[in-house]
């Protein structure tokens, strides 16, 4: 037997397990992944049999099949590192699986990846894919008969007047409070202890940052806690979910509840578009994201991959040396995931990224314009469709202007390498060398339909409103 055939030998156990492989996952990579697993499982009595039982009888209950957790939680297979449960779910169930954010362990699993135990379960039938929650339609009054005094416009205007000349800054995860560290401030006039470096006003009625369903305190390779479907009335720690009635003043009695028009959310063909800027100059065409997993990096991509927005391809005659130097440091950039009605940003660059997301700031009780620094290797949830839906449902009862204000939530700004705000010498995002603007199409189109149904505003929208 020559050396080549010796190393290309595939054990019967590996061949047997590969028989259940799904889709067109790379043959050699899948084989190496399964081979590495077999070597680990052979050390445990009954583990191989349990895995084969799970794969051959997917509808039947099965036990956990575990391997030891590595120091960083990841497993290396042929120069590619990944989370073990994601790797084997990809091999045996979902070849298109992109991220750990898409998986949720079943209740029967005793060693789910997120539990941080010494052993981690890789049984692909102990996990399920997160499904996008069905958002209830917004009920828009057919005839606007409420008193304009009930409008929240005054609150938003006051909020705008209280905005600092420069955005406040927060660093992930240091500025993000750990669960249950502060009670929820009920008064819309109270200052928010979460707000970094300031006691200025933040979003009135924003939910507490102790929501256990939020992965903000975890590094990129750690999955968030289990996704909670909307029908589950309890959060993971047994506490009640946030009270949506706290998000806006009570429904004005002038509105006849029966006389409403339902406006449903529809998922668009492209979930977002991304525009690239250098200082205050837009560069190149907008990138329209059809894949739920999008890379924005500093490289060039001759294959014209539809899942990548390569900033290295874009030219600008007005580019100065600072911009050139910054572009060289973008590197792997940012990975954007749209999973289960939530948007995550994972920093793959060696340099930090800086994010201004009003939805994220609302969730954590920060000032609306706060800029959050995401260091290399970390991920942050930057938008939540369900929270947005709850805000929109409340806002329609308080006037056109209040709903219109929510358009600001649907645009996320993100700079590479260089930050901006009170702690940086750059005061505005347009002063940063390289940045992108992300427009969320689903929420924006929903808002547009709601505003169309509402008709004209009581107070004309202007540049100062």
From Swiss-Prot:
Functional summary from the UniProt entry: Transcriptional modulator that plays a role in various cellular processes, including embryonic development, cell differentiation, and tissue homeostasis. Upon BMP ligand binding to their receptors at the cell surface, is phosphorylated by activated type I BMP receptors (BMPRIs) and associates with SMAD4 to form a heteromeric complex which translocates into the nucleus acting as transcription factor. In turn, the hetero-trimeric complex recognizes cis-regulatory elements containing Smad Binding Elements (SBEs) to modulate the outcome of the signaling network.
Pfam family, one: MH1
UniProt modified residues of type Phosphoserine: 463, 465
Processing after translation: Phosphorylation of the C-terminal SVS motif by BMP type 1 receptor kinase activates SMAD1 by promoting dissociation from the receptor and trimerization with SMAD4. Phosphorylation by ERK2 MAP kinase in response to EGF or HGF prevents SMAD1 nuclear accumulation and transcriptional activity in response to BMP. Dephosphorylation, probably by PPM1A, induces its export from the nucleus to the cytoplasm. Dephosphorylation is inhibited by association with EGR1.
UniProt biased composition (Low complexity): 179-210
The UniProt record lists the keyword Phosphoprotein: yes
Biased composition regions of type Pro residues, renumbered to the chain: 221-232
Gene Ontology annotations of biological process type: anatomical structure morphogenesis; BMP signaling pathway; bone development; cardiac conduction system development; cardiac muscle cell proliferation; cartilage development; cell differentiation; DNA-templated transcription
Subcellular location: Cytoplasm; Nucleus
Alphabetical list of InterPro entries matching this protein: Dwarfin (IPR013790), MAD_homology1_Dwarfin-type (IPR003619), MAD_homology_MH1 (IPR013019), SMAD-like_dom_sf (IPR017855), SMAD_dom_Dwarfin-type (IPR001132), SMAD_FHA_dom_sf (IPR008984), SMAD_MH1_sf (IPR036578)
Disease listed for this protein: SMAD1 variants may be associated with susceptibility to pulmonary hypertension, a disorder characterized by plexiform lesions of proliferating endothelial cells in pulmonary arterioles. The lesions lead to elevated pulmonary arterial pression, right ventricular failure, and death. The disease can occur from infancy throughout life and it has a mean age at onset of 36 years. Penetrance is reduced. Although familial pulmonary hypertension is rare, cases secondary to known etiologies are more common and include those associated with the appetite-suppressant drugs.
Residue ranges of domain MH1 in the record: 12-136
Oligomeric and partner information: Found in a complex with SMAD4 and YY1. Interacts with HGS, NANOG and ZCCHC12. Upon C-terminus phosphorylation: forms trimers with another SMAD1 and the co-SMAD SMAD4. Interacts with PEBP2-alpha subunit, CREB-binding protein (CBP), p300, SMURF1, SMURF2, USP15 and HOXC8. Associates with ZNF423 or ZNF521 in response to BMP2 leading to activate transcription of BMP target genes. Interacts with SKOR1. Interacts (via MH2 domain) with LEMD3. Binding to LEMD3 results in at least a partial reduction of receptor-mediated phosphorylation.
Record PTM N-acetylmethionine, positions in chain: 1
Domain MH2 positions: 271-465
Disordered: region residues: 162-248
Family per record: Belongs to the dwarfin/SMAD family.
GO molecular function (one): DNA-binding transcription activator activity, RNA polymerase II-specific
GO CC annotations on file: chromatin; cytoplasm; cytosol; heteromeric SMAD protein complex; homomeric SMAD protein complex; male germ cell nucleus; membrane; nuclear inner membrane
Tissue specificity note: Ubiquitous. Highest expression seen in the heart and skeletal muscle.
Keyword Oxidoreductase: no
Effect of residue 297 to H: Reduced trimerization
Protein name as catalogued: Mothers against decapentaplegic homolog 1
